[in-house]
Amino acid sequence: MSEQNNTEMTFQIQRIYTKDISFEAPNAPHVFQKDWQPEVKLDLDTASSQLADDVYEVVLRVTVTASLGEETAFLCEVQQGGIFSIAGIEGTQMAHCLGAYCPNILFPYARECITSVVSRGTFPQLNLAPINFDALFMNYLQQQAGEGTEEHQDA
């Protein structure tokens, strides 16, 4: 009976925190006089590390760059971190948990932080759409499988 309990999947959020915030408006104040039709670019990255047995830190980095033509209106980067207790899974399931499930939890916090910082820069409201981290993770796995196939073909 105790062996069964040890293999059960457990997941617990220990802490969610803002690890880093950066905001730049390099062309302020003259950018405020321009028509606000920005091109908005969103970059995402995740990283994870094991802190202790069954304890992991996951950091979601979200970078938003708004440009008006060739000029950068603003650049905002947030690193949203979380510490999670995860046990009873391994391999691809653990990779999915750290690379998709945890970022899904962290993204709303990062999105709120970015929205707040951008509004403090007196730019119009920025509403980031939800991100499907499960689909991004599947794309990543497909790319990794494709790269592995290419390496075998080259050999």
Curated annotation (Swiss-Prot):
Annotated compartments: Cytoplasm
InterPro entries attached to this UniProt entry: SecB (IPR003708), SecB-like_sf (IPR035958)
Main location: cytoplasm
A single Gene Ontology CC term: cytoplasm
GO molecular function terms listed in the Swiss-Prot or TrEMBL record: unfolded protein binding
SUPFAM superfamilies: SecB-like (SSF54611)
Assembly, per entry: Homotetramer, a dimer of dimers. One homotetramer interacts with 1 SecA dimer.
Free-text function comment from the UniProt entry: One of the proteins required for the normal export of preproteins out of the cell cytoplasm. It is a molecular chaperone that binds to a subset of precursor proteins, maintaining them in a translocation-competent state. It also specifically binds to its receptor SecA.
Name assigned to this protein: Protein-export protein SecB
Source organism (scientific name): Shigella sonnei (strain Ss046)
Lineage, broadest ranks: Bacteria, Pseudomonadati, Pseudomonadota, Gammaproteobacteria, Enterobacterales
